[in-house]
Each structure stands twice: as C-alpha cells, then as structure tokens.
C-alpha cells in the first residue's frame, strides 16, 4: 500500500528524467523530389526485380505428374558413388544406417482419414534390422542391392538413426521403382 502512494511532484520528476534520455522520434524518409534525377524512366518490368542475372536459370517445380518423396527427391536418381558419399556422411556422424521399403506408396497419402495416422504412408517396412556397428558404406550399398532384388517395384530409403538421442537424423530415397 505504501509503495502505491506517490506525490505528483515525484511523478513529474521521474517523467521528465525519462523524457530527457529519449531519442527523437522517426520522422520518415526524405522526399525524393529534393534529389536530382539523372536517369530516364524505364518501363521494362523485367528490370525492376533482379537478383544479379540469375533469374534466367531458376526453374519452378512442376506441380503435376511429379511426386515429392523426401530429402533429395527433387534431384535425379543418385548414382552408386553419390549414394556411397551420403552413406559415408551418416556413418561419419556416428549414425546407425537402416533400410526401409514401401511396396505401394512411396509418398504420403490419405486413405482412411484426412488427418495423419499410421496408414498414411509415413511408416515403411524395415529391411532386416538396423545395421548397428556398421562402419563400411559398401555393406549398406550391398543391402540396398539385396532389397532391390527382393522388391524391384518398391521404394527404398536409407535412414540414419542416432541411437544416443534416439532420433532419425537423415532419410533419403535410394531407389524408386521404374516409371517414377
């Protein structure tokens, strides 16, 4: 109760002290009319927005006829050398490699309900067991070749599992069936 009672002189003093240390308010930009104009008016709309000439090489992902799967799915299929580099990366991080496959849908879909559930394409079948203790990328690539032979019309992905934090750290499509 005592702290809420102040004299009006104390309020005025503290307000003036706060105003003395304040910065002047922003008054806006200067008028462009005061600067001399030495260039002609360009009505070409392509010159308005530019990122240094790189606009011509950018492409837009086609929304029809191409499914988006997971990480790196927008790229062309990875070669064996590129797969080995990705696998070596996850092994160097100390993650456990594991293969998973899906025979019907290699992408998220809604069949039984509109909200995410078990049967929406997120959960794939594990190929054998996680490769605990694996230190050679060619072993993982060999398992991938076996999975391709067993299920040639399936999507196969490689995941890297961190068994300390118990999370999946990397996942990418290693094989797509013909026609996808």
From Swiss-Prot:
CDD domains: RuBisCO_small (cd03527). Residues 1-56 form a transit peptide. GO terms for molecular function: ribulose-bisphosphate carboxylase activity. InterPro entries: RuBisCO_ssu, RuBisCO_ssu_dom, RuBisCO_ssu_N, RuBisCO_ssu_sf. GO terms for biological process: photorespiration; reductive pentose-phosphate cycle. It comes from the Eukaryota. Keywords: Calvin cycle, Carbon dioxide fixation, Chloroplast, Photorespiration, Photosynthesis, Plastid, Transit peptide. It is found in: Plastid, Chloroplast. RuBisCO catalyzes two reactions: the carboxylation of D-ribulose 1,5-bisphosphate, the primary event in carbon dioxide fixation, as well as the oxidative fragmentation of the pentose substrate. Both reactions occur simultaneously and in competition at the same active site. Although the small subunit is not catalytic it is essential for maximal activity. The basic functional RuBisCO is composed of a large chain homodimer in a 'head-to-tail' conformation. In form I RuBisCO this homodimer is arranged in a barrel-like tetramer with the small subunits forming a tetrameric 'cap' on each end of the 'barrel'. This is Ribulose bisphosphate carboxylase small subunit, chloroplastic 2. It comes from Petunia hybrida (Petunia). The lineage of its organism: Eukaryota, Viridiplantae, Streptophyta, Embryophyta, Tracheophyta.
